[in-house]
Amino acid sequence: MLSIAAGSVFLAPVTIGGQQFSVVIDTGSSDPWLADANFECYDTTTFEPVDEAACYFGPPYDISRSATYTHLPDRSLNLSYASGEVLNGRMGRDTFTMGGITVPQQEFGLVDYAVWNGDGVSSGLVGFAYKTLTSMYAGEDPKNAVAGKAFKYNPLFDNMYRSNITEPVFSMALARDPYGIGKGGVMAIGGIPDIPFGPTWISVPIVPVGINGTSNEIEYQFYTIVTDGFSLSADPSAQFAPIAAAKLNPRKTPLKGPVDRKNPNSTTVNAIVDSGTTLVYVSDSIALQVAQAFDPPGYFNEETGLYEVPCGATPPTFGVSIAGKVFNANPDDLLLQGGPDRCVSGVQGNHNGLWILGDVWMKSVLCVFDVGAGRMGFAGRQYYGFTWDE
C-alpha cells in the first residue's frame, strides 16, 4: 500500500479497463468509483464551480481508452461522506484487477460532479464495507435520488469471494511511513500478510447495526465491533499489556464509554474499524482527557472544533480494549500536523456521533476482516520493529 498526506491516506493500485490507478482503500464505505475525464469540480464551502484542479484528483478514468466498459442504463451514483464531500455521476461496468485478482464487469461509479478534497494521487476510491452501504439510485440524474431507495449491488470484494476467486477475508497492516518513502503497509486479500505481529490473537463478532429500510431487519453495514473501553497512560507501555494492568497501574486510567443504563458499570461501546478515517473518534469527554494527557496539555479550539496540542508536546499512550486485551496506538501517531504551526490530537470527539477506530489506531494493529465468518481478528504489532520490502 502507498501512504501519502503524511500517513493519513492509504492507497492501493488497481487496473480498470486497462488503465492503472491509485485508489483510496476504505473499509468504512462500499462503492468503487473513479473521477471521469470530464468531471466538474465544485468548491467544498460554496458549492460553486471551480477549476477541476481544486478537487486534486489523480489521473481520471477515460471511457475511450477502455475496450471493456459498458454503461449501466437508468442508474446513477449519489454519494455523500461524513466529511461533507459529495459525488454524483453515472454507473458503469468494467474489468477490475486488484492484488492479482480480476473481476470482469464490476459495477462502479463514474464521477461527473465532485465536491472533493483530494490528495493529488488517488483517482478514486474502492470501498470494502458491506453492499448495504452502496449508493446506486434509479434514473440517469443523480439529483433525483431518493434517500433510502438505493439499489444495492456487489462491491469489488463481494464479487471476488462470491465468484470463489478468493476466500471471504481480507486484512490490513497500515504503517506511518516513518522514513517518508511512501510505504503505507500491506493489505492481503484472501488471507493474512506475512509480517511480524504479536503473540496473541483475539477474535470478536462483527455487529450488525443497520436497519433494512424495506424489511426492518437488522443488517451488516460497517465493520462494527464491541470494545470494552479505552485506557490512557502518561508513560509509554508494553504493546501487549493486558487490560488488568490498565486497571491496576495508578499511572494508567481506564476510560469509560457511554453509560449502559442496564449496567452502569459497563464500558462497552460499538466502534467502527475504518481505514478511510484518519483519526480516532470517541466521546468528547474521552477526547478531552486524551488531549490533556499530552505534555504540555492540549486544549479544545472553539474555532476549528478540534482538540489541538503544541507541536512539540509528548503524546500519551492511548489504548483500545477488545475482548479483554488492550491494543495501544503508537504514541508517535497521536500527534498530527493540522496546519502551519498547528498540531492536533489523533483522538477527537465525535459530538455524540459514531465511534470510529481510524488509521491512528489501525497503524499499530493487524486487522483481519473475516466477512465469511462474520468476525474480526486483531493482533498487536511492535512499533515499526521491522522494515518493508522494497
Put a short name on every predicted segment:
Residues 30, 39, 113-115, 131-133, ...:
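Conserved beta-strand elements of beta-rich interaction domains across eukaryotes
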Residues 113, 312-390:
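Aspartic protease catalytic domain
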Residues 14-16, 22-26, 32-34, 125-126, ...:
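Short hydrophobic beta-strand that contains or immediately precedes a catalytic carboxylate
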Residues 28, 186-195, 201, 205-207, ...:
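Extracytoplasmic, non-cytosolic globular domains
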Residues 1-8, 50, 138, 388-390:
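N-terminal zymogen propeptides
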Residues 15-19, 97-104, 168, 190, ...:
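Short strand-coil-strand connectors
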Residues 4-121, 293, 315, 323-324:
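Signature of the N-terminal lobe/flap region of pepsin-like aspartyl proteases
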Residues 1-5, 104-262:
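Aspartyl protease catalytic domain
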